[in-house]
Curated annotation (Swiss-Prot):
GO terms (BP aspect): cell wall organization; peptidoglycan biosynthetic process; regulation of cell shape; response to antibiotic
Molecular-function annotations in GO: undecaprenyl-diphosphatase activity
Catalytic activity: di-trans,octa-cis-undecaprenyl diphosphate + H2O = di-trans,octa-cis-undecaprenyl phosphate + phosphate + H(+)
Family statement: Belongs to the UppP family.
Stated name of the protein: Undecaprenyl-diphosphatase
EC annotation from Swiss-Prot or TrEMBL: 3.6.1.27
Keyword Magnesium: no
Subcellular location: Cell inner membrane
Amino acid sequence: MPLLQLILVALIQGVTEFLPVSSSGHLILLPRLTGLEDQGQAIDVAVHVGTLAAVVLFFWRDVRAGLIGLPRALIGRLDTKGARLALGLIVATIPTVIFGTFLYFTGLSESLRSVAVIGWTMLVFGVVLYIADQRGPIDKSASDWGVRDAVIMGLWQMLALIPGTSRSGITITGARSLGYNREDGARIAMLMSIPTIIASGVLLGTEVALDADVDLMRDMGIAALLAMASALAALALMMRLLRSVSFTPYVIYRVALGMVLLFIAYG
């Protein structure tokens, strides 16, 4: 793969994976604007690994607490913060697994990957994020997250399987509609991404593991490192800005990009 394409794909995926702007919406524009071919599943796996490493490193304290609490959560002992976090992440992932299985076996996952669908989801869910952010109460923090809210946010996250929705954007929408403050809502949404990124990475990885050669492994390593670095930078910037800035700038960007995609689809 050309080095320039490798860099562009890794940076786009890394920056947009955790911002509420949809990585798929950007990646579908790349070949149309540059004439480059699709990067392939192997590079998709690599950038997933890179973004997974980024979120684990950025929220390592929460990840450690969740891993330590996981055995207690599995036997129903929710007497620690880590156990409650682990249970919440498990519960929140279930709707996505069920819906993803449905899309896979019905073949709908491929039919949804059109420019028109991505344009509409970018636009519509951008507006939904704005409404939730501006009208939602701010009376909850991460310590209030329990099974009920995990189920609700998991149902929101399920919609992210429709390309253009933005996994981080839709889960943040769910968090704000439930009353979580912006910073903690984003933090919960980022932690919820870990099981889903692992699941999608494993699914893609099983399809490319036997076909990788030395050159491809090198490209995958470069892509993973670039995606991790750019994702870490994007996470740090967003979490810092959320202390004083709403999600409105992301909404404006989403709506504008959605309109561009709709123009491409119907123009």
